[in-house]
Structure formats: C-alpha cells, structure tokens
A protein has these predicted regions:
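Histidine-acidic metal/acid-base catalytic patches
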Residues: 2-58, 121-123, 181-203, 207-289
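Active-site acidic/histidine proton-transfer and metal-coordination neighborhood
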Residues: 10-17, 30-31, 95-200, 210
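Active-site-proximal loop/turn and secondary-structure-junction residues that shape catalytic pockets
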Residues: 42-44, 69-71, 89-92, 131-133, ...
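Catalytic domains of carbohydrate-active enzymes, especially glycoside hydrolases
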Residues: 52-72
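Short acidic, glycine/proline-enriched helix-loop-strand junctions
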Residues: 73-87
Length: 289
C-alpha cells in the first residue's frame, strides 16, 4: 500500500472516533437547564442598592440570591428571584458541627433555621463543620454525624436540606487553613452515615478543585449527596472565564445532564478593573446550558 493511501485510510476512523467523542460530550438539551444565583462577593466595588442588584440579576436571567436576610426576601420575590440558601444553624467556620460542647445550641438554632427556610420558601440551610484545632478527622466525623442525626428528623419533616460546605485548607488568602471538611470524601462519608435525604453537601467547585481536583467524576459519582453548588475561578477566586484553569461551560453541562435541580451560585470576585454587571452577564452565559 502506498504511504499516502495508508495515511488517508488510517485517518478516517480516527477522525470519525474523535467526532463521536465530541458529539457525546456536547449536551443535546436546550439552554437554561440550571438555576443560577449569586453571593454578595460578585458585587465587590459597586454601590448598587439591594433592590437595584435584584433588578439587574432578574434582567440577566438569574433565579436567586444566596444568604439574603429575612428582610431582603420580599425584595427578591418582588423581582422574581428566590433565596438560594439561608444561614441559621449557629455554626461558623471557627466553631461548627464537630464541637460537641455546642451541640445543644446548634440543635436549637438549626430548628429555628429550618423554620426560617420553610417560611421564606428556601430549601437549603448551610451548616459549617468548623476548624479541627487538633481534632482527628475521625472524631470530627463522629461528632458531625451525632449532631446531624439529632436534626435530620425535623429537616425531613419540613423538607429542608441541611448542607455542609467543603472549603480548601491550602490557600492562606482564603483564611480557611484548619477546616475539617477540606476534602470531598469527608463530607460524603458523613452524609452516608447520617443516611438522610435532607443532609447533603454544598459542593464549592473553587474549593474542591484546589483540595481534590477531579471535578466532573466527583459530581457524577456523588450528585445525590449534593444540594447546592458554588463556582469561582481557580486560582484567584475571580470570574469563571478563560483566564482560569477550569472549563466551567463543560462542567455546567455535566451538572445539567445529571438532572441536578438545585442552585448553582456564583461566588467569584470581579477582577481589578472589571465591571461587575458585564462580568455577571458573561459568567451567566458560561453556565447557561
């Protein structure tokens, strides 16, 4: 066989195979499958009032805002937006679910937080595992399981998801260097042990990429344990554009294809000199699959 003939015939199945792979990776469904919300960080450096922010978000196509106050919720609703996630478990990044000495007050606060969520139409209540301060991961997991077992019944009764957020312990600037939930596997293990449809994790893709990587496989294997998602560019926690290492448009397609129905919240900060509204418009379209 002549060299030219051989190369032509050999290339044909290769091209066909690559085309098939790309076709398989491209979502066939229409855009708009993900509900997008924002955290306050996206407005850094702006002077818009809360109502003006809501009007801008609604115009772009966003569906919610994370961590509004109870007083802000009516303004959200007047603009066709919803609270994506609420706070109110008595936990913090310093003192969280793993502190046994705080379990009584965490239980009381979480019941009130669940009631608040139910009253404003929000299905997600954030709960923070907290700092280790010398505690082993095993003891911390046992303590988290213990308090979550105490609140899961009420969460199930009210239909509210209590979710733990993963944070990385590597980047000093994030000020989360001693968090116990700094690898996805720790939180998934806790969820499996609690075994409740209302105890899940907030999968923060910025933190998870730094902590573990392997984002899409983790999503595919654990989507049933995820009730909320945060996004920001890696490194730097800025926009989710082509100036950082993750392909968020592809990741968004994976999330949508898995049938995920929760919010995907933008938690980036605009890069120096960038206009927040224009960045919101661009980043919204990146996740619009």
């Amino acid at each position: 066989m002549e060299r030219r003939t051989f190369l032509t015939s050999a290339a044909a199945p290769l091209v066909t195979g690559i085309a098939g792979q790309l076709s398989a990776q491209t979502p066939a469904a229409s855009r708009g499958r993900l509900k997008q919300s924002v955290m306050a960080s996206v407005w850094q450096g702006t002077k818009y009032s809360f109502e003006e922010r809501c009007q801008i978000l609604a115009r772009i196509g966003f569906k919610g805002v994370d961590l509004p106050t109870a007083q802000q919720v009516p303004i959200l609703m007047q603009n066709g937006l919803a609270p994506g996630m609420m706070t109110g478990t008595g936990t913090s990044f310093q003192n969280g679910l793993i502190r046994k000495e705080l379990h009584d007050q965490i239980e009381e606060a979480t019941h009130k937080g669940i009631d608040l969520c139910a009253s404003v139409g929000c299905s997600v209540l954030i709960a923070l595992p907290g700092e280790r301060r010398g505690m082993s991961r095993e003891e911390g997991a046992d303590n988290a399981v213990a308090i979550l077992n105490r609140v899961k019944g009420y969460a199930e009764q009210k239909g509210i998801n209590v979710c733990m957020e993963i944070t990385n312990s590597k980047v000093a600037a994030d000020q989360r260097t001693d968090q116990i939930f700094d690898h996805t596997a720790w939180g998934i293990d806790v969820c499996k042990r609690v075994n409740s449809p209302r105890v899940k994790i907030l999968y923060d893709i910025y933190h998870a990429q730094i902590a573990d990587g392997d984002i899409t496989r983790t999503l595919r294997e654990n989507i049933d344990h995820i009730c909320h998602i945060h996004v920001a560019g890696v490194p730097g926690r800025q926009e989710i554009d082509d100036k950082q290492e993750l392909n968020f448009h592809f990741i968004a397609g994976v999330i949508a294809d898995l049938g995920y129905t929760g919010f995907v919240a933008h938690e980036w900060r605009p890069a120096m000199g960038n206009d927040s509204v224009k960045s919101l418009e661009r980043c919204f379209e990146i996740l619009n699959v």
